[in-house]
Amino acid sequence: MSTSRDRVRQALSHQGSDRIPVDFGATAVTGIHCRVVEALRKHYGLSYKPVKIVDTFQMLGEVDRDLADAMGVDCIGVGGTRDIFDHDTECMHEQVTPWGQKVLVPIQLDLTQDKEGDVYVYAGGDKNYPPSAVMPNGCFFINAIERQQPIDEDKLDPMDNLEEFNSITDEELDAYKKKVNEASATGRAVVASFGGTALGDVAFVPGMGLKEPKGIRSVVEWYMSTVMRQEYLHEIFRRQTDIAIANYEKLWAVLGDKVDVVLTCGTDFGSQESQFCSVEVFNELWLPHYRRMNDWIHEHTTWKVFKHSCGAIVPILLGLIEAGFDIINPVQINAKGMDSGMLKREFGSHLTFWGGGVDTQKMLPFGTPDEIRRHVLGQCEILGKDGGFVFNSVHNIQANVPVENVIAMLDALKTV
């Protein structure tokens, strides 16, 4: 019988195993909302405790080791010590969410609602500056607040958009070493998210961890810049890639092959129906920087490189392969053109599909348990053939998903 780590490594090598490997909770794009995590713990009869939030922005809950055992999860995640709001994730306190759930969040985060029912979030927890994000009344996650200053084209400086991307410190290296050693000891495949390596991810563009963000911080302006200000973005990506490679060199020296997979970038290139940029813009603006980063990883480490991109991305998949990505996620099977069979036939020898196991827009929240079982078994039959598949949902499991539907999904996996 394969170990969890062996199972994932075999999938990444496009080899079969004793069963399809499973990930829930190893990254910020393969997680589970804290409401569902609490419901799963209750279902499995695990001890009650406030769910620890591992991604504050999306309110994802920790899939602790006892829950991972119950769910049959083969992966474990390792992240940094600060969240997207520059809050200290090593220093937590108990708070009650607007929907009445007790959770553990960074001490700088106060979940108290204002008179309209909104919860405001501040960069570094500093209320001397305007809020950088908000959880609107009735919402189960947090949204960015754009603080774009007037843009003077003559004074645009790429360094302003690099303020949050820095060389890794000795303290951070020590923290990663401790976390990776603990994660590796579980026998699960270690998936690391070191941060600072996502090129042009609009989740980071607003600078929610900065008190006074400068540069281009409007998502609309950023997308327009992919056409209007390409040299500006090139310079950002060049310098960011320099920083990333220097950090990876230090991380490899400390962590080595105890890490199996690195999530380098979560930039979305697809919408439900199309792409956010043309193939030509992708090849000109992103591909050379991705390739330089990934080439370094492949030449100097044993790590496999994980790329997240939502949406209808078939036209750019060849570019992602050329750029050296090993893994694609979330495999949005209900987006235009993203047929599972076609993806496996055309791209399955080059990419490992990490996701696509169950549709999270319609099937998982609204299907019956029996419909979900059939759907999951069908996806596993298609994507799991000859390896190259790690089961996960299409992006994170959201707050409104009935726990019995998640159990139906997991029970179906046990029969594959």
Please describe what each predicted stretch is.
Residues 36-37, 41-86:
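Segments that shape or occlude catalytic/ligand-binding pockets
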Residues 96-175:
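A gly/proline- and charged-residue-enriched helix-loop-helix capping module
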Residues 1-41, 46, 50-53, 139-416:
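Active-site loop segments of alpha/beta catalytic cores
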Residues 80, 87-90, 123-124, 201-205:
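Short, conserved acidic/polar surface loops in the N-terminal third of protein domains
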Residues 66-117:
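Acidic/aromatic-lined carbohydrate-recognition and catalytic surfaces
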